[in-house]
Each structure stands twice: as C-alpha cells, then as structure tokens.
A protein has these predicted regions:
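Nucleotide/phosphate-binding catalytic cleft detector across ATP-hydrolyzing
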Residues: 1-159, 167-287, 294-340
C-alpha cells in the first residue's frame, strides 16, 4: 500500500471468538472479539487482547463485551466500536491520513437478511466505503486452495467459536448448507462445567480455553501425539481455598464427547442432503475442516473413522476464512458473483 494510496483493501473474518484482518496479503490483526467499555459514557477503553485481559476482572465502571454470539451480532453498537478499534490497528501511525476502506467480511451461510444487514451497517459505520459480504464456507474453501468454480462437489466444515458451518460447494455456489450453533464456545463451556462438577474447582472462561488448547481432544487414545498433563489452578467451590488439579486429555475427551457428537450428527445430516453425484465427489476428495475447532486433537481421525470419508485439516485452518476473503477481494472481477 503506497504513500498516495487513497483506497485500502481489507478482508475481515468477524468471528465470535476472534477477529482476523488481512491487508496486502498479510495477517495484520488477529485479536479476540472483545471490547471494554466505560459504563458511564459507553466509550471504548480497550479492544482485542487488551480487552480480553480485562474479561471477568472488571469493576463496576467497566464492562467487557463479546459483541457476537453464535456467529451473529448480538450487540450492534459494541460491534461497531470493536470493528472501528480493530481496523485502526491496521494503519495506526503509518500514514498522514486514513485511506478509504474497501472491505469484504465473512458471514455465516445461514445468516438471515436482518443479520447480513447488521454486519453491513456495522462495517459502514466503522468507515467502510465499499462493503462486500462473502459466505464463510466459500471463503474458507478459497483460503484452503479449492477451485470453487470447478464442476465437482467439495464439503467444508467450518467450526468457529459460535457456530459450525457445513456447506457443499460446486460451480461457484453453495448447493446445500447446514449451520448449527454448536462450536468452540460450547467446548469451552463443557470444560468449565466439568471442572466444577468433577473436580469442585471454579475455572474462568479463559482458563477453560487454556485447558482446551493444552489437553483438548476428540479421542481418548491419541497414541504418540498425546499431550502432557495440564495443571489447573483455581478456587475450591466449597471451601474457596486454592486448588491444583492435574488434567489429562482422556478426561477432557470424555467431557467434550456430547458436543463433538452434535457436530458429527450435523455433518451426517448434511451428507444425507447431498445430491448423489456430488456425494461421490466428496467421498473421492474428502471433507475439509476449517476454523479454530479444526485444531481439536483427533477430531479429523474421529470423523474419518465415523463417516468412512477422509477429513483433511489444512495448514492454517484458523485463518482460512480471512485468507479466502482476501483472495476474493483481490480478484473481485473473478469472484464478484460470490459477493453479497
């Protein structure tokens, strides 16, 4: 982006858990979708990582908000302020003036017109001049490197923080899709509840996320890839005294089983509704996992064993949607038909 550029292209994956922004083919923002506001004035105090550090630690004059729930905007004003704050990070201090923004944003394929309008309005209020929307499974497919215009079927399972998107793509369109509001946040909540019930220890959402990252698993037998035991610190829910609880991946796999089964059933349901010719392509090509949920240990193997169809985890599943949205915006002439 040159000194005299008046328009800047940015691609945004506006997620329930994290927001990723790509500009000039580089990930320039990868921050939690959290904002801290002053209760008295509603002015932004912090955004992203800085706001997440305050999460569940604030006093009465500060409130921390996650503006998205289940993949869609739950708090319009907070979302607008959060987007504005995160977009400022893209060009902070690098220019004498802020350029006009041309942006593309990934949205869930099951979004209603009202939900799409909310995203567009938030982006426009956050200084977006030209705002395009692209369905997340399509963006993920492009980001993974799939030829979405090819006359063959490909299935994408995008497991985000708030929703899981399952879509069959062929000839540049979504032939069928299934969106469920079961995803990474549910896995985190499962861990919180399990630690409370099984070990009598209260853990914060942030600590539950750390447990998920360190010992989260979809299988009770990971063989040589088994992670080390993770030690959890927290207060005893009965005595309030500090506790140390060693947690292994096998027990976390048991506690996540119900939520993982819901994702399995959603994939099976999507396969049932897939036309036979495209189904044959999917069996041949395999199914691609995207989103942060794709990083859950053993998930690809569990799904492969259950469906008898190979599941693939791309190199960087967390950034597939943002990367694909960036490619689509950069090649707008070619991918204009995908934009909303």
């Amino acid at each position: 982006m040159g000194f005299f550029s008046f328009v800047q292209d940015i691609a945004i994956d506006l997620g329930t858990a994290n927001t990723i922004i790509i500009s000039d083919d580089k990930i320039v923002v990868d921050e939690p979708s959290v904002i801290a506001l002053d209760r008295r004035t509603d002015k932004m105090i912090a955004v992203g990582n800085e706001a997440k550090m305050m999460y569940e630690k604030t006093h009465e004059n500060i409130r921390t908000i996650r503006p998205l729930r289940d993949g869609v905007i739950a708090d319009f004003s907070a979302c607008e302020q959060m987007m504005r704050g995160l977009i400022k990070m893209v060009h902070s201090g690098s220019r004498l003036f802020s350029p006009s923004l041309r942006m593309v944003i990934g949205v869930p394929s099951g979004s209603t017109e009202v939900e799409l309008r909310a995203v567009r309005d938030s982006a426009e209020h956050a200084d977006g001049r030209d705002v395009y929307l692209i369905f997340e499974p399509m963006a993920a497919a492009i980001g993974i490197g799939i030829d979405v215009e090819a006359p063959e079927g490909n299935m994408i399972v995008d497991i985000g923080g708030g929703s899981t998107e399952i879509a069959v793509i062929s000839l540049g369109g979504i032939v069928s899709n299934n969106s469920i509001r079961t995803a990474g946040d549910d896995l985190t909540a499962d861990i919180q509840e399990y630690m409370y019930r099984q070990h009598n220890v209260k853990v914060s959402e942030r600590m539950a996320e750390r447990i998920k990252i360190n010992v989260g698993s979809a299988l009770t037998d990971l063989g040589d890839e088994a992670p080390e035991v993770f030690v959890v610190h927290g207060p005893n829910r009965i005595t309030a005294l500090p506790m140390e609880v060693p947690v292994c991946y096998q027990e976390i796999a048991h506690c996540l089983d119900k939520t993982v089964s819901k994702i399995e059933n959603a994939v099976l349901s999507a396969l049932e509704n897939t036309p036979p010719e495209l189904y044959a392509d999917i069996v041949k090509n395999g199914i691609y996992l995207a989103g942060g949920g794709a990083l859950l240990r053993g998930l690809d193997k569990r799904l492969t064993d259950k469906m008898h169809i190979p599941f693939h985890v791309p190199e960087d599943p967390l950034h597939s949607v943002a990367k694909g949205a960036g490619v689509a915006l950069k090649n707008l002439d070619r991918f204009n038909f995908l934009m909303r």
